[in-house]
């Protein structure tokens, strides 16, 4: 037991240090035994959560090459955490989902539609995430996947545009950020301009691949608008 705690502590130290990315290959080599600790790190605050998500992506992508069914079971575990029937609030789960799909092309092809379904509100039986705080993460997750595999996320565009008018002000900014990760489209401009001009000061927490930072929803929309009209 003490050895297990020591290994978990070492893993945590690898992720919280300044050179954390240098440890990702070693973490990925650890395989399935690192999955449980990494899931637990999703609850340790924004920076550790994002870095643990990246590590989960690397571990699961490697497993997908060697043990594809095991990797799919990790995705199923993620989907269960997003399910209301699980009794859990899936903090950090959308981010982990996105990083796994960004790291693994086969898993992305199989599961990208599930990730996008969390922002699709059909007004009836659907996968829509109705927890405002968790939905912010869902928008970010789609943007993260769009960075790595934009073609898989093109069908999310109308729902991201709809997200610019989400009832949650932070969700609006996160939807704008996600939209900006897609190939530019002039059709995005009117809705982005409305949000940019709205003076929405809701702080949106973003991750640049190394650190967490904040911008307001209207700032994000203004930057996305600039990109859409180039």
Language-model region placement:
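Eukaryotic acidic, Ser/Thr-rich intrinsically disordered low-complexity regions
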Residues: 2-16, 20, 192-230
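Conserved hydrophobic register position within alpha-solenoid helical repeats
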Residues: 23, 52-56, 93, 138, ...
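Flexible loop/turn segments at the boundaries of HEAT repeats in alpha-solenoid HEAT proteins
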Residues: 23-29, 60-71, 100-111, 144-154, ...
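Buried hydrophobic core positions in alpha-solenoid tandem helical repeats
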Residues: 37-39, 74-79, 111-119, 156-161, ...
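Non-membrane alpha-helical segments in proteins
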Residues: 40, 47-62, 76, 92-100
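Short inter-helical turns and helix N-cap capping residues of alpha-solenoid HEAT/ARM repeat scaffolds
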Residues: 44-48, 85-87, 123, 127-131, ...
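Structural signature of alpha-helical solenoid repeat scaffolds
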Residues: 57-61, 98-99, 139, 143-144, ...
């Amino acid at each position: 037991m003490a050895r297990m705690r020591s290994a978990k502590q070492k893993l945590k130290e690898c992720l919280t240090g300044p050179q954390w990315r240098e440890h990702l290959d070693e973490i990925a080599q650890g395989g399935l035994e690192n999955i449980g600790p990494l899931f637990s790190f999703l609850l340790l605050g924004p920076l550790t959560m994002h870095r643990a998500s990246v590590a989960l992506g690397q571990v699961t992508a490697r497993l997908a090459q060697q043990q594809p069914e095991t990797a799919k079971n990790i995705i199923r575990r993620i989907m269960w955490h997003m399910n209301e029937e699980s009794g859990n609030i899936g903090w950090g789960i959308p981010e982990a989902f996105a990083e796994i799909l960004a790291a693994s092309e086969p898993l992305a092809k199989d599961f990208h539609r599930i990730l996008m379904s969390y922002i699709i509100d059909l007004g009836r039986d659907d996968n829509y995430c109705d927890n405002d705080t968790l939905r912010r993460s869902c928008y970010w997750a789609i943007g993260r996947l769009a960075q790595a595999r934009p073609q898989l996320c093109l069908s999310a565009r109308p729902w991201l545009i709809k997200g610019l008018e989400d009832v949650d002000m932070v969700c609006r900014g996160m939807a704008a950020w996600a939209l900006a990760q897609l190939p530019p489209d002039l059709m995005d401009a009117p809705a982005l301009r409305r949000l940019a001009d709205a003076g929405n000061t809701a702080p949106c927490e973003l991750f640049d691949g190394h650190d967490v930072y904040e911008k307001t929803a209207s700032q994000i929309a203004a930057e996305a608008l600039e990109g859409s009209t180039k």
